[in-house]
């Protein structure tokens, strides 16, 4: 006998909090947290997933009353997992994101007392801003739902790892990206090779990744397939066929075949360069960056320029020595190099450090030193050596700083600390750890909207020595 779900009816969504979760209340005033697709001022019925002492967690069963904020989208605009806020007007998105950054400090108001809250910086592009998009092929067969769809190509359905929604146009990619997507859709349908089934590990088509430079227009495609489905001679024939097809799409300047034979639904495997140049070039300001299939690069080029502009403007020390921590491929360090005496870029991922070194040489930057090491361990070594920075810039992953890092960082006694955050929750956790006894004070906070139509929000925080 199936599980009998508890439901709650007529829950008003008051607002969206971190991670795009809807906040409402039941008839007793108890908090109700609603995942996936909640829109402020709508009224919904929910299925209760967890009933805790201080909150109820659930998902939407049905919308009883649409939000007055909700835009009526044309069929050209489809809502996928990567753009759940698309029905919400962009001005309202900015307002909600700015409020979320303020609210993460609600339990530590003394940390931001006297700080200047700057208006949120909007992305220069609201649509078509992504320089990288990943599409998936899938088949979805369900006897329970009466579905026998052996070909789907698009994005994962919101909250569903095993379902793909057929895509006709992605508003986060530009027209060239969408043209390439539609061409590959037709190509895959016509050649009749089956889509990959993750449950049986059988099938051929898996993913299509499109990387397109906003500044140069150079475009890379990565075609991810299960090459074990074909025999060796068939694989070679397919590669010839694929090269011929790609040659007709003039916007493609680089192409790779990804031999993806693992069971996990991720873009991994052996990359084989099959056409065009091995890399594409993107620009940030007047700097050039080579992007390979595995390279990390901010997915909103123009938004990244805004983020780094804000970061640079936060630094008030003239000609500083800068520690660039969690440097990734070194974009922040390279942008800051022209106004710094010396930059030390620290990153744990070897491939990212290699990209950094290559791009430094490409741009003839001489005052940046790249160190491939864990941040907390290297800081300990530098402390023993007596190395002293004027400014420390921190750009950690979503998990935030390593627990040992804030205390060590404080021991260097820099004039300024700039924290570039992609996760408001860990930002609010780490800032008090850096200055538990008031050694530093927060002077400036600027939210930056790098990802319109999503719940993601960046923020740059400046701290100065007291």
Annotate each language-model stretch with its function:
Residues 210, 217-226, 288-292:
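Short, aliphatic-rich beta-strand segments
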Residues 2-9, 15-18, 229-466:
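Rossmann-like S-adenosyl-L-methionine
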Residues 41, 173, 300:
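Short, conserved phosphate/pyrophosphate- and ester-handling motifs at nucleotide-, phospho-/glycolipid
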Residues 61-72, 79-194, 215:
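Extended interfacial segments that mediate partner engagement and assembly in macromolecular machines
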Residues 162-206, 227-257:
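Internal alpha/beta scaffold segment
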Residues 22-27, 154-157, 222-224:
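Short, acidic/hydrophobic/Gly-rich beta-strand patch recurrent on exposed beta strands
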Residues 1-78, 377:
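Terminal RNA-binding accessory module
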């Amino acid at each position: 006998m199936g599980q009998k779900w508890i439901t709650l009816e007529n829950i008003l969504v008051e607002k969206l909090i971190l991670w795009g979760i809807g906040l409402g209340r039941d008839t007793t005033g108890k908090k109700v947290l609603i995942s996936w697709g909640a829109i402020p001022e709508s009224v919904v019925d929910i299925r209760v997933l967890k009933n805790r002492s201080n909150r109820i967690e659930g998902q939407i069963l049905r919308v009883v009353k649409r939000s007055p904020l909700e835009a009526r989208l044309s069929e050209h605009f489809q809502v996928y997992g990567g753009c759940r806020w698309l029905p919400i007007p962009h001005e309202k998105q900015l307002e909600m994101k700015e409020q979320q950054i303020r609210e993460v400090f609600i339990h530590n108001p003394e940390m931001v007392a006297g700080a200047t809250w700057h208006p949120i910086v909007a992305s220069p592009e609201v649509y078509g801003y992504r320089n990288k998009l990943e599409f998936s092929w899938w088949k979805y067969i369900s006897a329970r739902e009466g579905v026998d769809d052996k070909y789907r190509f698009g994005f994962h359905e919101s909250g569903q790892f095993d379902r793909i929604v057929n895509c006709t146009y992605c508003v986060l990619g530009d027209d060239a990206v969408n043209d390439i997507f539609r061409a590959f859709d037709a190509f895959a349908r016509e050649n009749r090779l089956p889509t990959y089934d993750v449950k049986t590990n059988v099938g051929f088509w898996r993913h299509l990744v499109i990387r397109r430079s906003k500044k140069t227009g150079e475009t890379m495609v990565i075609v991810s397939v299960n090459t074990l489905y074909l025999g060796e001679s068939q694989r070679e024939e397919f590669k010839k066929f694929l090269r011929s097809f790609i040659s007709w799409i003039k916007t493609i300047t680089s192409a790779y075949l990804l031999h993806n034979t693992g069971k996990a639904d991720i873009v991994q495997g052996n990359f084989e360069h099959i056409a065009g140049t091995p890399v594409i070039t993107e620009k940030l300001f007047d700097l050039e960056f080579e992007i390979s299939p595995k390279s990390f690069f901010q997915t909103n080029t123009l938004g990244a320029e805004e983020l780094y502009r804000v970061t640079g403007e936060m630094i008030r020390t003239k000609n500083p020595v800068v520690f660039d921590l969690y440097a990734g491929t070194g974009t922040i360090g390279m942008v800051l190099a022209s106004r710094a005496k010396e930059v030390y870029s620290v990153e744990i991922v070897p491939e990212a450090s290699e990209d950094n070194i290559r791009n430094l040489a490409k741009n003839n930057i001489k005052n940046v030193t790249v160190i491939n090491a864990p941040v907390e361990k290297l800081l300990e070594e530098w402390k023993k050596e007596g190395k002293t920075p004027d400014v420390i810039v921190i750009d950690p992953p979503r998990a935030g700083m390593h627990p040992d890092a804030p205390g060590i960082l404080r021991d260097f006694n820099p004039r300024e600390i700039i924290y570039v955050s992609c996760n408001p929750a860990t930002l609010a956790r780490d800032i008090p750890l850096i200055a538990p006894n008031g050694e530093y004070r927060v002077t400036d906070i600027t939210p930056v909207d790098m990802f319109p139509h999503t719940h993601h929000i960046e923020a740059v925080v400046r701290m100065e020595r007291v």
